[in-house]
């Protein structure tokens, strides 16, 4: 739809809209300008229809709004000369409309969707790095940002709006991207933001407690993740069989690829598979020997921990399922690098090994600590906090995990937002059998400094919770802060 005309855009929905040339599509009235199409949806927190007058005042050419109440589907109202077209179930139609508006960019590259509680960022980055090594022009979309490898622009959400996703994909196509690995969040699935995307492969990493403030319970959270497989006609489905939910899903997905590092293939499994046979952890990373439906081999990687072995095997299985040659994948595996802020290691002679990780759920913290322990000769330190205005139930669980798996624990502020930091730390400490084992230090810089200065050279210090983030949310303020830069400064290295 090169001319971006309102009539042509809405015709497939059976709506007779007036002819209007359109420049860009936007959900934010504050960012709308002359010639744009403003889309007014009823969101989780705000109703975009309240901002139609503001968008019209800023010169938009047309408005599409959610139909509700007395206003019927297809109704066209003229407000100050601007057509406002009402559409039923607009949220669920928006991905398709945005795809049409931006000429369906997802059709022009290999698009991979990765969902799960943990491991999405690392798995997408590994997919992009690995495919790039095989000649693709690769991109990532997710928590760290969107863009070609090495040129990623920060993003506000793991999965952007339906409009932003299609626009970002169009920009990637214009930059000649041929491969894109996208993190697909549960929020994004429930809200239909990826509904019209033509994923060639869908990957499931794992499921553990997170986002219950939004989904309510684990059953609804699981159902949200399942949408990637139940509502998309994805040819290649790659499932972590070591996860209980993944194992259950495999019974519904006989054509999927089952991936295991714990020899947990489903009983009498007839489908494709990949399994680790031997895993050796060492101070430089890990060596993995595997077998699969495509053959076997050994991969040497600088990644840390068991869960990164799982991420690596999921990425490998995905690329094999997409017909990338095993021989070439093995040749390029050693070039894979750890992801920024994901079990990222900082070292300098005479100082402890410091690991910065994004772990902010009980399961992720457990896996990060277990990963760090595999590479630890001395004592294991853990510095972490929990975000304010988010799931309070996970706070004591994370406290219990830290007490059980670390030798020393420092509890500090994460992103307190509008909660009292003291109250958040108090919630965390209720999970300790012996709260006296934890040291509470509110200032995050002070907490990180304290751990690194006290730890010995053969110790490992895990700084968990913020990973790649370069800010801290305190009240309504967004402060400049980075665990990575703080650690690098203390160790005298470059982040």
Swiss-Prot record:
Q: What is the name listed in the Swiss-Prot or TrEMBL entry for this protein?
A: UDP-N-acetylmuramoyl-L-alanyl-D-glutamate--2,6-diaminopimelate ligase
Which InterPro entries does this chain map to? Mur-like_cat_sf (IPR036565), Mur_ligase_C (IPR004101), Mur_ligase_C_dom_sf (IPR036615), Mur_ligase_cen (IPR013221), Mur_ligase_N (IPR000713), MurE/MurF_N (IPR035911), UDP-N-AcMur-Glu-dNH2Pim_ligase (IPR005761)
A molecular function annotated in GO for this UniProt entry is: magnesium ion binding
Cofactors named for this entry: Mg(2+)
Question: Which GO terms of type biological process are on file?
Answer: cell division; cell wall organization; peptidoglycan biosynthetic process; regulation of cell shape
Which EC class heads this enzyme's classification?
ligase
Q: Quick one: which residues bind meso-2,6-diaminopimelate? A: 390, 414-417, 465, 469
Modified-residue entries (N6-carboxylysine), positions: 225
Q: Organism source for this protein?
A: Photorhabdus laumondii subsp. laumondii (strain DSM 15139 / CIP 105565 / TT01) (Photorhabdus luminescens subsp. laumondii)
Q: What is its EC number?
A: 6.3.2.13
Keywords for this protein: ATP-binding, Cell cycle, Cell division, Cell shape, Cell wall biogenesis/degradation, Cytoplasm, Ligase, Magnesium, Nucleotide-binding, Peptidoglycan synthesis
Subcellular location per UniProt equals:
Cytoplasm
Write down the chemical reaction(s) this protein catalyses.
UDP-N-acetyl-alpha-D-muramoyl-L-alanyl-D-glutamate + meso-2,6-diaminopimelate + ATP = UDP-N-acetyl-alpha-D-muramoyl-L-alanyl-gamma-D-glutamyl-meso-2,6-diaminopimelate + ADP + phosphate + H(+)
Record-stated family? Belongs to the MurCDEF family. MurE subfamily.
Residue positions annotated to bind UDP-N-acetyl-alpha-D-muramoyl-L-alanyl-D-glutamate are 27, 29, 44-46, 157-159, 185, 191, 193
Query: Which amino acids does the record list as binding ATP?
Result: 116-122
The signal peptide here is none
Its post-translational modification remark reads: Carboxylation is probably crucial for Mg(2+) binding and, consequently, for the gamma-phosphate positioning of ATP.
> What are the disulfide bonds?
none
Residue ranges spanning the membrane: these are none
**Function, as annotated:** Catalyzes the addition of meso-diaminopimelic acid to the nucleotide precursor UDP-N-acetylmuramoyl-L-alanyl-D-glutamate (UMAG) in the biosynthesis of bacterial cell-wall peptidoglycan.
Q: Which GO terms describe its cellular component?
A: cytoplasm
Main localization category: cytoplasm
Motif Meso-diaminopimelate recognition motif: which ranges? 414-417
Specify the pathway.
Cell wall biogenesis; peptidoglycan biosynthesis
């Amino acid at each position: 739809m090169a001319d971006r005309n309102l009539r042509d855009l809405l015709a497939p929905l059976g709506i007779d809209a007036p002819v209007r040339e359109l420049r860009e599509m936007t959900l934010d009235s504050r960012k709308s300008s002359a010639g744009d199409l403003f889309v007014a949806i009823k969101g989780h927190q705000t109703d975009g229809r309240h901002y139609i007058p503001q968008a019209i005042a800023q010169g938009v050419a047309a408005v599409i709004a959610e139909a509700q109440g007395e206003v019927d589907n297809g109704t066209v109202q003229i407000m100050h000369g601007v057509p406002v077209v009402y559409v039923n179930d607009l949220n669920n139609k928006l991905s398709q409309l945005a795809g049409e508006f931006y000429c369906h960019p997802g059709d022009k590259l290999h698009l991979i969707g990765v969902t799960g509680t943990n491991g999405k960022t690392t798995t997408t980055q590994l997919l992009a790095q690995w495919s790039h090594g095989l000649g693709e022009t690769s991109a990532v979309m997710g928590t760290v940002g969107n863009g070609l490898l090495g040129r990623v622009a920060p993003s506000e959400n793991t999965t952007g709006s339906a409009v932003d996703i299609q626009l970002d994909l169009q920009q990637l196509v214009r930059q000649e991207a041929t491969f894109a690995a996208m993190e697909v969040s549960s929020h994004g699935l429930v809200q239909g933001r990826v509904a019209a995307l033509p994923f060639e492969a869908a990957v499931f990493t794992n499921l553990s407690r997170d986002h219950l403030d939004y989904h309510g319970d684990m059953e609804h959270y699981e159902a949200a993740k399942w949408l990637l497989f139940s509502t998309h006609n994805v040819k290649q489905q790659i499932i972590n069989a070591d996860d209980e939910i993944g194992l259950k899903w495999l019974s519904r997905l006989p054509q999927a690829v089952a991936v295991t590092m714990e020899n947990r293939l489903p009983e009498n499994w007839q489908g494709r598979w990949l399994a680790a046979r031997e895993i050796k952890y060492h101070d430089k990373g890990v060596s993995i020997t595997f077998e699969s439906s495509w053959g076997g081999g050994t991969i040497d990687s600088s990644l840390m921990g068991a869960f990164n072995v799982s991420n690596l095997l999921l990425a490998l299985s995905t690329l094999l399922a997409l017909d990338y040659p095993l021989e070439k994948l093995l040749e390029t595996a050693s070039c894979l690098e750890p992801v920024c802020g994901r079990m990222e290691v900082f070292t300098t002679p005479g100082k402890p090994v410091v690991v910065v990780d994004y772990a902010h759920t009980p399961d992720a913290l457990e896996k990060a600590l277990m990963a760090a322990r595999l590479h630890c000769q001395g004592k294991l330190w853990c510095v972490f906090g929990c975000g304010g205005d988010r799931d309070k139930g996970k706070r004591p669980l994370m406290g219990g995990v830290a007490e059980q798996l670390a030798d020393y624990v420092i509890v500090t502020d994460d992103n307190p937002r509008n909660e009292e930091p003291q109250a958040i730390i108090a919630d965390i400490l209720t999970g300790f059998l012996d709260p006296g084992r934890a040291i509470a230090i509110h200032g995050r810089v002070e907490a990180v400094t304290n751990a690194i200065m006290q730890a010995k050279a053969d110790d490992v210090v895990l700084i968990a919770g913020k990973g790649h983030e370069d800010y801290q949310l305190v009240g309504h303020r967004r402060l400049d802060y980075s665990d990575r830069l703080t650690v690098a400064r203390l160790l005298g290295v470059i982040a």
